[in-house]
Amino acid sequence: MYYPEPITKLIDSFSKLPGIGPKTAARLAFFVLNMKEDDVLNFANALVSAKRELSHCSVCGHITDQDPCAICTDTSRDGSLICVVQDPKDVIAMEKMKEFHGKYHVLHGAISPMDGIGPEDINVPDLINRLKDEEVEELILATNPNIEGEATAMYISRLVKPSGIRTTRIAHGLPVGGDLEYADEVTLSKALEGRRDV
């Protein structure tokens, strides 16, 4: 289909976003064209500002507009407890829960030999250096419950074991309100493994 070049460029730009196909990209492009010019400028400025002003915390790797980030500099948090996550979005999910009061370490990915991603390609070396420099008592591995996340957690736990730091894995299992009959075998197995006393 023919579009004027500015629209084609806009559609191509939206198509680069995850989960956005050509039809959705075209819909978004035409939506933007119908917005007020001030709103479009604010939107464009917000994109540019986020890209320019945000970086990764030099301590934990989380996205921040200050370095070190607000979590790393918060003295009320328990520095002896570090939760290892794959992505900054995982930190946000944990923070919404308002139950974890330790600190974080963001890996920015997971080990995936099939994709050519090894431990050196994610933030594992910085984690190991951090464990040497800080007085950490427990490392909570909160990587995703998929093959890559499990491989990453296993690798880190084996790497950390000689240090004597307690290493735990978050439990995986059934969602609240879920029915057993709809759960797959792996989910049920993980739920059973993660059981606790009541």
Swiss-Prot record:
Record-linked InterPro entries: DNA_Rcmb_RecR, Rcmb_RecR, Rcmb_RecR_Znf, TOPRIM_dom, TOPRIM_RecR
Tree of life domain: Bacteria
GO molecular function ontology, one term from the record: zinc ion binding
BP-aspect Gene Ontology terms: DNA recombination; DNA repair
Keywords: DNA damage, DNA recombination, DNA repair, Metal-binding, Zinc, Zinc-finger
The Toprim domain, residue ranges: 80-175
Zinc finger annotations (C4-type) as residue ranges: 57-72
Its job: May play a role in DNA repair. It seems to be involved in an RecBC-independent recombinational process of DNA repair. It may act with RecF and RecO.
Family matches, as PANTHER family: RECOMBINATION PROTEIN RECR
HAMAP family in alphabetical order: RecR
Entries under NCBIfam families matching the protein: recR
Family: Belongs to the RecR family.
Name this protein carries in UniProt: Recombination protein RecR
Gene: recR
